[in-house]
């Protein structure tokens, strides 16, 4: 085919550039990614909210309604679990990718709850787009999650501390190839019903105490199918068009965080999906060259919900102070978060996996009252420094953390709006983190509102 006839199969005039290797590479829009760099609850929602104001599409690529994001707009506090928090931007499309698992009652409940709070969600059904390849969480997945946790407690004396939202069981169904997807729900409902009954029976045989009202469930699912049908699209084609069409700002909102990743987190005390950068490609169906900036969100100290190793944890007055001042309670579970010092070993590890282009440092104001601040800089095992982050939980529980002590600033920073206005020692704390990690800090959070995010560049 001659050049003047153009290249076939390039939608919306996508440009084909010959590369050195002679292959054709598509030049198009790129996605901006926001990821948690610790154990979650870093304030990703706030960074997303900031970027979502200029976004055309805001995506979720993994997890389910086990995530919890809080966004404050015009003094109204919205809580998001499954919906991309960017849905409050009236001009953006909120896209739920194939890597996300969807509990339909939870989805509609969440939307309706937020609708009552303010104007942010008006017209949300017209702005939501769901990948037809996304798996569905059924009520029996959630019930099985609770039973599994109970069994772990009885058999091993400890559970995983899951949110009981059915996330583990539905990803298990997906891997076992017995799961059902949005495309099944919105096409032939009688075929869907047969497969649903089969899956329900399998769960009943695995968990005899499970009570499943099959007909009642199917009746509800049929109602949801009618409501959700206009939102369901071929996600791969939809994003391909968006990436290779006219200029667009596409934002990806990561749920959970690096240390909760199924592969790279503190296994087994992790979630059931990849919440590191690889999950963006597999959870949306986009190639790696479509990934642009990757922003890591880091709390100025460290928190963790539930059990699992936590090297810099402070079971003392400092930990209690961070917990109280930081209002450290989980958005999804209401559980108290464990608190400790910032851990640079953990952050270097998160950076190795994600390749952060810049960081957002949140909740710096919580440290305002401290006269000195410690930062974990290295780990030792049996007196020897180790260069890596241990995979084995028993080993991680045994590490001895070496700390660097930095001077505090004993000054209220809540009303600071530029980097220059920060107390000298607060600036030093920020620059120290940048230097140690080799990643620039782009934002600093000193409060709950949109305005309290200081942008450095």
Curated annotation (Swiss-Prot):
Q: Give a single Pfam family match.
A: Adenylsucc_synt
Which is an annotated GO molecular function term of this record?
GTP binding
- Give GO BP annotations, semicolon-separated: 'de novo' AMP biosynthetic process
**UniProt xrefs under PROSITE patterns:** ADENYLOSUCCIN_SYN_1, ADENYLOSUCCIN_SYN_2
Question: What InterPro entries does this protein map onto?
Answer: Adenylosuccin_syn_GTP-bd (IPR018220), Adenylosuccin_syn_Lys_AS (IPR033128), Adenylosuccinate_synth_dom1 (IPR042109), Adenylosuccinate_synth_dom2 (IPR042110), Adenylosuccinate_synth_dom3 (IPR042111), Adenylosuccinate_synthetase (IPR001114), AdSS_2_vert (IPR027529), P-loop_NTPase (IPR027417)
Q: What is its EC number?
A: 6.3.4.4
Q: Does the keyword 4Fe-4S apply?
A: no
Cellular component (GO) terms are: mitochondrion
Explain how, and how many, cofactor molecules are bound: Binds 1 Mg(2+) ion per subunit.
The alphabetized UniProt keywords are: Cytoplasm, GTP-binding, Ligase, Magnesium, Metal-binding, Mitochondrion, Nucleotide-binding, Purine biosynthesis
Question: Does the keyword Mitochondrion belong to this entry?
Answer: yes
Q: How is its activity regulated?
A: Inhibited competitively by AMP and IMP and non-competitively by fructose 1,6-bisphosphate.
Q: What does this protein do?
A: Plays an important role in the de novo pathway and in the salvage pathway of purine nucleotide biosynthesis. Catalyzes the first committed step in the biosynthesis of AMP from IMP.
| Name of the molecule in the record | Adenylosuccinate synthetase isozyme 2 A
Q: Tell me which species this is from.
A: Xenopus tropicalis
GN (gene name): adss2-a
